[in-house]
From Swiss-Prot:
This is Queuosine 5'-phosphate N-glycosylase/hydrolase. Its EC number is 3.2.2.-. Queuine binds at residues 53, 237, 239, 314-315, 319. One of its GO terms (biological process) is tRNA-guanine transglycosylation. The lineage of its organism: Eukaryota, Metazoa, Chordata, Craniata, Vertebrata. It holds the Pfam family Q_salvage.
Length: 341
């Protein structure tokens, strides 16, 4: 992929040429200070992925890796037109919305004996079967069900042809390199090719490919096949929630023109200049927050419990956004429907 900037290079280039989205250095420091208080706790450790989320697999085995692959293959566009009227999945006495509604639906299907994490099943699954698997417990369906069906079929067929039907084989081919795994995923599976143009350059975000690498690292607890020596090279996952929380915390600022658009709920399109700026600046902002946090930890003379990387910051900030939804209502997220995030 000649002339294509990787996610970190892309975000730096976008932030340097942005017209409507800006990174606030004071806000970056404030977010780093907020995270400093969490540096010694479970929130910023790889183990937190399982400990803090009951829907994620408990095991660190092939079945768990294949669960991660299916959920991240479908990990896009969960926002609802109205917050009080949305897709909800009830599972084991609890209700889940957003991304967690997908995880609950996958677990519900497995409990019902539907082998949704098996490539030989989802390579040929029908649209009606997908509608049933992803059914909502409200009258609001999960968005983009037809696209999810198409992508499951396409991805399942490729996984069977190239990797013997198991994502663990793909992980093993990457030889403990996060970058190699990310590129293998992007090259093998078309729906993961999150690439666009900005100022005449080809830029990449690879949101789902990066989160797939991160979740594989997390489900395998950073051990064995999941011990990626270059895991810190993975950046945050540029979606529609992270920019909202970064703006809420004052690390990201929008121009009046863009803010007006977002407040009106105008839809952006994938590859629009402003959409690219929001994603690129968010990604670079988290890189700066990480650098600042590591400096603060060093100044305090503390040793973190493990490696602090952009993945763990993303996990924490995403959970923060989920837990502070009410506080963040005044800051709009950017509305877009696409398969990349």
């Amino acid at each position: 992929m000649d002339g294509l900037l990787n996610p970190r290079e892309s975000s730096k280039f976008i932030a340097e040429n942005s017209r409507d989205v800006f990174i606030d250095s004071g806000g970056v420091r404030r977010v780093a200070e907020l995270l400093l208080a969490k540096a010694a706790g479970p929130e910023l450790r790889v183990e937190g992925w399982k400990a803090l989320h009951e829907l994620n697999p408990r095991a660190a085995d092939e079945a768990a890796v294949n669960w991660v692959f299916v959920t991240d293959t479908l990990n896009f566009s969960f926002w609802s037109e109205q917050d009080e009227h949305k897709c909800v999945v009830r599972y084991r006495g609890k209700t889940y919305s957003g991304y967690w509604s997908l995880c609950a639906a996958v677990n519900r299907a497995l409990d019902e004996g539907i082998p949704i994490t098996s490539a030989s099943y989802y390579a040929t699954v029908t649209l009606d079967q997908v509608r049933n698997i992803l059914r909502s417990d409200t009258d609001v369906s999960m968005p983009l069900v037809e696209e999810r069906h198409r992508i499951l079929n396409e991805t399942g067929k490729i996984l069977l042809e190239k990797f013997g039907g198991s994502f663990l084989n793909c992980v093993r081919e990457s030889e403990n390199s996060a970058q190699k795994l990310m590129h293998l995923v992007v090259e093998s599976f078309p729906s993961y090719r999150d690439v666009t143009l900005f100022e005449g350059k080809r830029v990449s975000f690879y949101k789902r490919a990066q989160i797939l690498v991160a979740d594989t690292w997390s489900v395998l607890e950073g051990k064995g096949d999941g011990c990626f020596k270059d895991i810190s090279s993975i950046t945050m996952f540029a979606d529609y929630r992270l920019p909202q929380v970064l703006a809420h915390l004052g690390a990201l600022k929008y121009s009046d023109d863009l803010l007006k658009k977002l407040l009106k709920g105008e839809m952006l399109s994938y590859g629009d200049r402003q959409e690219v700026e929001i994603r690129g600046c968010s990604l670079w902002c988290v890189e700066l927050i990480r650098d600042c946090l590591l400096e603060l930890i060093e100044q305090k003379g503390e040793k973190p419990n493990g490696e602090i990387n952009s993945i763990l910051l993303d996990y924490y900030l995403w959970d923060y956004a989920h837990d502070h939804r009410e506080d963040m209502k005044g800051i709009p997220f950017h509305r877009i429907r696409c398969i990349y995030y």
